[in-house]
Amino acid sequence: FGVEIPIVHEKTAAHAFYIGQSHLTAALLGVDWQEMKRDEMIVAKYKDNYILSGARPRGALYAVYELLEHGYGVRYWTHAVTDWPKASQFYLPSYTKRFAPPFFSRHAYYDLINKHQEFAVKMRTNCTASTPELGGREVLIGFVHTFDRWLPAAKYFDKHPEWYSLRDGVRVGGQREGQLCLTNQEMRKEFIKVVLEKLGPHGDGAMIDVSQNDNISYCQCEKCQAFVDQNGNQTDLLLDFVNEVAAAVERHNPTMYVETLAYQYTRQVPGTVQPRKNVIIRLCTIECMFGHPLNSDYNASFRTDIANWKKIAPQLFIWNYVTDFAKFYQPMPNWRHLGKDLQMFVDHGAIAIFEQGCHGPGSTGDLTDMRVW
């Protein structure tokens, strides 16, 4: 706006922007900072002053962007294109808002977000920015498909082929080729050892992923099949394994969480095994018909699954797909129900969202910049 705003002491401030938490702003707003929800932000007017604050570490930052956008008309279109409206003189708008995101973890998986941290923060996503100045990020150790990350076949398979899935009489391992033999107790011991080592440098509230590789070659050995036959389905076997890891993690630090996938052959709820309280279920929509809303009859089976997971998941995360992975350039007819799908997730108790769009080299697709915005 061409106006330089001096930084002044709070006690002597008048006609000021109060940014961040303080005893004074807490009193003026009538809030207890400790009771604020994750990433909650407040944009409030007090006489001729503005209070821009919220939950640490990102609430105040979000409040500043909120006022710039909705009070002054600034638009952050992409990392390289910003629209700053001109005004003949500086003014205070009348805009106020208090808001806490329904999803505590928010990631739009596009290169525009992944490679440009400052823009990611302006879009209120919180899984990519790593510096304190940008509010940090929600850390998920390992990301996804971590069986082969924590026990890579390239390292362990030659000495311990029995740790890996048996398929048609042959042991197979690797991210694209196989899974783990989840009933193998020696494998479980080593896996837990590795997970605890990975958690070592991380503090309270850390999340670590323990999830199947990106294939459907689950183990067909006698022990694994007997467990499935006795308890219900492949999800039971996965959760029995994940629960044992989660129990070890809880002994290490009771504030930490273990995330796993409800994906492909584990998308359905288990028959008997229930997830521990420190287990996060990330339900994936991969089999859905994305040209139709998730609450349509075309996606009835997913509606059944998410309703069932809502009943038993201590924490429910979502991995959603919002592009055509076969042809990124082809128009994807999901514009009108993107918001409806997100609302469906909220209605079923989901508290984190990962929207996988077109990404990778070039990251060019169906109006990608607009989709990110």
Whereabouts are the PLM-identified features?
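Surface-exposed patches in mature extracellular/periplasmic domains of secreted proteins
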Residues: 3-11, 79-80
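Acidic/polar loop patches that form or flank catalytic/metal-binding clefts of enzymes
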Residues: 5-7, 257-260, 315-320, 349-357
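Short, well-ordered secondary-structure micro-motifs within conserved domains or adaptor modules
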Residues: 8-33
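Feature activates predominantly on carbohydrate-active enzymes
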Residues: 33-240, 247-252, 262, 280-283, ...
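Short acidic/His/Gly/Ser-rich catalytic and metal-binding motifs that mark active-site loops
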Residues: 217-222, 290-291, 365
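Substrate-binding cleft/loops of secretory-pathway carbohydrate-active enzymes
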Residues: 259-287, 329-337, 362-367
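Glycoside hydrolase catalytic-domain groove-lining segments
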Residues: 269-276, 283-324, 341
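Substrate-binding cleft of secreted/luminal carbohydrate-active enzymes
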Residues: 333-373
